[in-house]
Amino acid sequence: MKRILSALFAFTFLFGVVPAEASASDGEGFVFEPDPGLIDMTKTRKTSDITIRDPFVLVFGQKYFMYGTGAAAGPGYGCYVSEDLENWAGPVNVFTAPDGFDGNGCYWAPECHYYNGNFYLFATYLSRSTMRRGVSVFRSQSPLGPFEEITGGHITPFDWDSIDGTLYIDGDGQPWMVFVHEWTSTVDNIGTMAAAKLNGDFTAFIGDPVELFKADDPVWLNGKVTDGPFLYKTKNGRLLMLWSNFNSQGYCVARSFSRNGEITGGWYHGVAPLYAKNGFFDLEGGHAMLFTDLDGRLLMCMHSPNKSSETVHETAVFLEVVDTGNSLELAQIRQLGLFKRLAIAFSDFLREAADRFRSWIRDIV
């Protein structure tokens, strides 16, 4: 009942409340020209032709750099480069696992962040020595690498399965890594979102990670997954997190909000997804991030669908997002008008509530 009341409160608060964006583009003052021996910018592929999961876009030097699961040739991490978000050169390997590297597969979800003059790759791999997935940090002087691991193995706890690390800089300038503690290594098999302070050179955590929330905290989600965290501050200074789980229609993008604007300040959850398969969108999708394009538009990048089939394959999707000051809305949805938006959100809420009620009945009968 407590979760249902919290959900109803969040629903009334949904259209006008809630959180924030990522870092602005760096390298504005010059044009980054990739080495033609490394990548041929004249040979491109359309976004829709590229199979990729967990896409992450860095804007630097008037170029877009798209990293993601499946972009590398062989063990490691890869990147595509574009000038218009439609035609992509590459991919090029930004990190290739050398002989003796501890990785044993699961080269997932690389994110590239420009910080204090260096490029940092936060990325997941499966460790040969621990047989756990974890997040490591890699550093380079170029967004195209080569990147070198600087953490001496996973930075996340060795006895956890951890994935999808992302960077957040708080109001005091303190860097944090927010990451997934996978359901595969939690006591109750429910995934959690975790965070830890980073030291100045991103080589280690300062203190132990803290749990932020669990996958089943939002009443409308029925999965045990916490995927793809991304932090954003709205124009009014509200701290928001995008992340992914499953509702009754499949993979989707959730919004959660800090109660006091701090990472560890406690989190509450919107009762409707930012993106989900519904009467407006035909395909599921998730593992989202935000960036500002070269025209100043706030865009959400995610992969959709969540699983390839004979007719569709996983690819990067870019959707314009509106920062309402307290929350985020998809521009396509916002154009529908308030009443239609409320109708879609309420329909989603009722469908998920009915699905939860049916599950509850099955459990007690």
Q: Where are these predicted regions, by residue range?
A:
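Structural motif marking the loop-to-transmembrane transition
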Residues: 1-2, 350
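Sec-dependent signal peptide recognition
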Residues: 2-10
